[in-house]
Amino acid sequence: MIQVQTILSVADNSGARLVMCIKVLGGSRRRYAKISDIIKIAVKEAIPRAKVKKGEVLKAVIVRTKKNLHRSDGSVLRFDKNACVLLNDSTEQPIGTRIFGPVTRELRTEKFMKIISLAPEVL
């Protein structure tokens, strides 16, 4: 569960290392976001000469959370870190060309098939 002020690591090669959630999108008073939800983020730490700079405000999709993810078949998934993939604000396609670490099957919608295809492992 991600809320405003949550610090997340970035799971792509866009150049950002750490980002902070500044808004959970999808409702006027929505407090929490889970895997496959889109949030608004601010870049807090980035590498030099990267595609994104510190202080930029972008959209991101959550790919991993520390909070347990319960599936209908009874299985439970949990990750060590909260992670997201940065998205282009207008097209909502990933900025990076590589994804690091596993992503979940919950991202398998029309919007995020690009992330699924770039990921090394889908759980």
UniProtKB/Swiss-Prot annotation:
Entry's Gene Ontology BP terms: translation
Q: Which SMART domains does the record cross-reference, listed alphabetically?
A: Ribosomal_L14
The record ties this protein, via InterPro entries, to: Ribosomal_uL14 (IPR000218), Ribosomal_uL14_bac-type (IPR005745), Ribosomal_uL14_CS (IPR019972), Ribosomal_uL14_sf (IPR036853)
- Can you supply one Gene Ontology CC term for this chain's record? cytosolic large ribosomal subunit
Alphabetized UniProt keyword annotations: Ribonucleoprotein, Ribosomal protein, RNA-binding, rRNA-binding
Under CDD domains, the record lists: Ribosomal_uL14 (cd00337)
Output the superkingdom of the source species. Bacteria
Report the GO molecular function annotations. Answer: large ribosomal subunit rRNA binding; structural constituent of ribosome
Q: How does it assemble?
A: Part of the 50S ribosomal subunit. Forms a cluster with proteins L3 and L19. In the 70S ribosome, L14 and L19 interact and together make contacts with the 16S rRNA in bridges B5 and B8.
Functional note: Binds to 23S rRNA. Forms part of two intersubunit bridges in the 70S ribosome.
**Which PANTHER family does the annotation name?**
50S/60S RIBOSOMAL PROTEIN L14/L23 (PTHR11761), LARGE RIBOSOMAL SUBUNIT PROTEIN UL14M (PTHR11761:SF3)
User: What is the recorded name of this protein?
Assistant: Large ribosomal subunit protein uL14
